[in-house]
Regions:
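Acidic metal-coordinating catalytic centers involved in nucleic-acid phosphodiester chemistry
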Residues: 1-8, 59-159
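Catalytic centers of nucleases
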Residues: 7-11, 15-78
Length: 159
């Protein structure tokens, strides 16, 4: 029974991601804007002004903990470091059952290093603090995203 619930939650997460993609597509204001699903991240938005790589998370049955977004943040940081000065913004967009009060925004470098980068991973990166600070200036975290049905309503309202 637990696997069935897990599969249902996973499928709902994919629907949530796809709905987010559709919503962003409907919100495009310019014919030169582009949206890619499963590009750098789950949803990549490119406008005249900026490019944003967005990781979507839907955990309706999960309390938010820093560990839930740590791995996606490390992937984003790794991408940022490999594409230095690429101008890409990064975003975590997620819905969680509870626990949003655990993350106080904006996050600073010490908090980022102690909660999102393991010591082993940090040593392997050979990264300077100024690079992390630069990455953080290009990062947005929204862990109070719209609930599944609310996001669907947003789509219908855009139509």
């Amino acid at each position: 029974m637990a696997k069935e619930r897990s599969a249902i939650a996973t499928i709902k997460g994919y629907y949530y991601q796809f709905d987010y993609f559709i919503l962003q597509l409907l919100k495009c204001n310019n014919e030169t804007d582009s949206i890619c699903i499963e590009g750098i991240e789950d949803v990549d938005l490119k406008t005249v002004d900026e490019s944003t790589a967005i990781q979507c998370k839907y955990y309706a049955g999960t309390e938010y903990n820093h560990s839930v977004i740590a791995q996606p943040l490390r992937y984003m940081l790794d991408h940022y470091l490999s594409k230095a000065n690429n101008g890409i913004k990064y975003k975590i967009y997620g819905y969680y059952k509870s626990g949003q009060d655990k993350l106080i925004l904006p996050i600073n470098i010490e908090f980022f290093k102690s909660n999102f980068i393991s010591l082993k991973a940090f040593k392997g990166l050979s990264i300077e603090d100024k690079q992390i600070i630069s990455f953080l200036s290009n990062l947005e975290i929204d862990i109070a995203a719209r609930e599944f049905e609310q996001q669907e309503t947003d789509i219908f309202n855009e139509l």
